[in-house]
Amino acid sequence: MLKKTLLSLAITASTAGLTACNISSIDNNDDVAKAPIQAGQPGQAPATVSPLFNPARGQLPLATDFLFGFPKAEDGKTPKYATDADGTLYHKGAYEINLLEERISLIQPGQEGYNPVLNALNEMDGVSINAELDIPLNGNIDIASVIPGKNIILLPLNYDDPLIDEDTKSGESPFKAEFTDYTVSVVQYATPPNEAEKFALRVNLTKPLASKTRYLVILANNGSDSIKSIDGKPMVMPVQYKSLAGDDTLLSSKLAPARKLVKNWTESAKGYLASKQQDPNGLVMAYTLTTGGGVEVLSTMAAPGNANSDLKQDPALRAVVAKAFADNPNDVAAAQQQAAGTLVGAPYNVPAGSVAAVIGLATSLETPGPRAISLPAAGVDLDSDGEIGLNIANFIPSYANTTFVNVLTGSIDLPYYIKAPQGAYTGENALTAPGYLCTPSSASDALCIAGKTSAGNTIVSQWEADDSLATDLQNPALTPPSANVTRLFPFAKKNGMRKAPVLVVKPAGTVPPGGYPVVIYQHGIFGDRTDSLGVAKQLADAGFVTVAIDLPLHGVMPTDVISGTTTPIFASLLGAKGTDISGFDAETQALYVSGETVAERHFGLTRDAVEFKPTAVSGTNPALNGSGSLFINLVHLQTARDNMRQAVMDLLNLNASLGSIDLDNDGNTDIDVTKVHFIGHSLGGIIGTTFVATNNLNGTTLNPNGNAALPLITESVFGMPGSAIPRLLEASASFGPSIKAPLTTSTENGGFGLLENSESYNQLFYVFQGALDSVDPASFAQAMNQIPGNLAKYMVIESIGDQVVPNSAPSPLAGTSPLAALLGTTQIDTGTSDFSSGKFFVRYKDADSSHGSLASPGKDLIEADAFTEIMTSTINLFSGGNPAVTGSTVAPIAAE
């Protein structure tokens, strides 16, 4: 069973290939320090203040390059363990270890000793680019004495990629310009009454760190500009750091790797201080950290031509072929010739006899591309006016007098990279496979039991590296060293295809010449595709078609969670005009409840009402009808990440397929793919920011190595989104309590037993953020901001006082306003006349709006005006104009 006790994240000496030697004492120097020592006794301040630095005792900043201190083979360079070659971090506590201190395997969910935080840390390809950096201290300090750029310095080093290149760039300065986008604060961690006080110097990022970059962190006193304790004493170098940086005989030869690192850090830091005309002898401590990926995985999945050409493995080979076909879109022979010429040379060295096979396999990669969107045939699903589809009044009764909008329900087959439950892929029948919704006939019904067990894939599965090229070519050299999808191995393996429902809302009447402009809509957490209907009606009145799909693990449920009655639109979506499924036979009702009739993306599963585990949805119990209730979880942080990455890939495929939409069944496309727009609400805006950035940066409009199948998203609206997702969730008035509850509940009562704001609690959020960096909009916003506003405009909407996605949070990157800032938006109000930036930020008054103002029209009359004003400015923007905002609900720009 899952062991929920979270172990300390203190970095043990084994991280750097050390035994746990106490280098400050000769006695008991082979004892293992299994827990961090205390800085002092309760109520006693240290005589001098210094950073905590003792690798043998696990006293280090969490984010250091000790996490890359892998054991080496006899040559001193090759990683001892093949899985270390994937570029991920290492922490001993996540592994089964034998008596020889050798790794056996990573402890997985369900196994004794499983720790979700350590498990996620070991699969990160570097430290977080968005989370705050904590430097533990042995006492409190005067924060006013800490001066960024003077006595605390964040210095990026000059590597192409520190995980590929051992040395900085030859002939160039080893240092880049200092990173200055941060503030500093002192954190006092919560501790039990019988433990010493704990403090840390926190570096609060106001912009993300650069991905795949090594940073040198320097703490240094500079004359009067010294870091001081609260009683005015200058900070001093830690004793253990000084010992490792010196030349005295080590107490154990196993400390040699740590000494090598510390000496390099010290030499680099002193050299840089001297170049700044600062006293090198003022150095207090220095260390390096190496950041993980940001945009790399999704950018490479979107357009394989972006893969790093230095890599000699599967992704790079596929990238060579993809680029050749992108360079020669209308000449297959020329593309094959170009690819062959590159593959046979260095660094790839593919044997001539294997080139054709490489090209054939590489072109089969599931890159986002056109896929058929199936819609009702002519004469089927007609509304009362004879139009194909259902009138929108079938869904929203208040629109009963609407005769100009029709709704079509169809489907699209999408590549699925997370493992689905058994029987859930296209072509399988979950109810007869036997699948995961079967009922075992006996304890020996192995097939059914295995199928039901596979439902657990929804909470513990994750993307795995694509190994098909190595397998199909029978060339072990091309095998990824692990299953981890990282910036070095960015291609995920497709597990199958999964049919997803598509909801299309169109204006009634004849298709205009050239086709309709189109809007992709993405709903928020716990919602479904029908959340688009209120917005889509307004858009249809203005001549736009709206296309919506569900997020992974979301979909229409048979029972309304509020009223407890059968969802009227559930029957409507299946083509029935009634409002209840009770009139159908039992077998059909079972199909409806499971979602298999329309292949709902929740697989007919929802969260158990008591525990966080999947269970079948109910046709009668609204408590078992939570769309998206399994989407974000703390059981396996990588699953939450990959649900989001899957959502981005789904939207990329949907965008690439818009040209296949035939609304009147005349065999011709009815969508103008030069006029593609996007609206995302809440989580849909969060994921939507990452999607639009990935799409626009990797289409051929802006990227010569891009994917020509991806139309440019010309205008976007991100409604109530936010960045730095873990801290956003923690600060949310709506979600915060449910996020904190399992963390702070005692282990005896099934929780993780953490003290809120303790060191371990903060480390959990650090790792959670690091796990999500490759999909968090904070990682993509600055790159998106580089796109000229005349090519792709966008608008961020904020409701002041939002109780779901906070406007801001204690973590500077978390919330709506920080994301708007990263995107380079300019706030506009009713008095704005300059719209030249193309990047806008609109804030709606607290009293007149809420988080749901974009998605829930008509539910709150007070907010009706806000919805109308949001849609008016949206339609203005999508119609090629400016998002001129009018009305009383828009908040004025605050005076400077």
Put a short name on every predicted segment.
Residues 23-424:
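Acidic, low-complexity Ser/Thr/Gly/Pro-rich repeat segments typical of extracellular/periplasmic
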Residues 384-514, 644:
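N-terminal cap/lid segment of alpha/beta-hydrolase-fold proteins
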Residues 385, 666-668, 802:
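Acidic carboxylate motifs that coordinate Ca2+ or other divalent cations, activating on Asp/Glu
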Residues 503-506, 517, 635, 646, ...:
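C-terminal subdomain of alpha/beta-hydrolase-fold enzymes, centered on the catalytic histidine
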Residues 677-689:
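Gly/Ala-rich beta-loop-alpha elbow adjacent to hydrolase catalytic centers
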